Amino acid sequence: MQGGGQRGFRAVDTDPSDVFDAHLAASQGVEPGVDLVVWPEDVVDVEGPVGGTDEGEALARVATATGATLVVGVIEGAGRDRFRNAAVAWGPDGRIVDRFEKVHRVPFGEYVPGRAVFDAVADLSAVPRDAIPGTGPGMLRTPAADVGVLVSYEVFFADRARGGVRAGGRLLLVPTNAASYSTSQVPTQQVATARLRAIETGRDLVQAAPTGYSAVIDHRGRLRDRSALGERAVLHTTVTLRDGRTLYVRAGDAPVVAAALAAVAGAWAPARRRPGRGRRATR
């Protein structure tokens, strides 16, 4: 699901209700009979838990109207200075069935390390609040399937995808948001990285972004569908739910680390055995 709109604007300069309304409108294009609808990251902005808000009620209606599981990227304010960045799932009956809160936050984007120090020497108005980090693997257990979740920036961390699959994820979802970037560089980088995550884990992957790129990638990393930047789009596709585990899911980075250590040891050992040049023994 991609609501579309202008790109190159900071979140603090964007009206959250406009973004939300755009995705509500786009949801009218969902075809009957779908099992799962995925909205992007940060397209709903509320104070406190989303379930008791007007936006939450509207999302429940979308889920019941489509008869599908609905996964939405939600920003929940937690007081004046903090917030949660969550992927929340509604079942076809309109009830919240699960949620995952983003673990890997973007430094100087979602929080400011050492805020008290930087606040004295810099303007931090573009990052007025700090995200509260989540815990555990990215996983949502839903009526449609158990799905691994990588919220935006987390797609760049292979261990997050591995953790979601090891926890039972049969499909990977990447709700993301690159609307603040005016060029195609970051959206392109995100899709390329998502393709790598799909190959590593052997899972089909669905990425949703408010202004692109939204994409569908198969378990071999092949790009099956992709939106254009800035457009309103609904990508309809069929994905395969998978259960097997690739070598990377089973072993993680251990084989690569072992190979690197072996290469270093192999290069070092001959140097240790090589006799010194230009030396002669005397008695």
Regions found by a protein language model. Name each.
Residues M1-R283:
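Enzyme catalytic cores with a strong preference for nitrogen-chemistry domains
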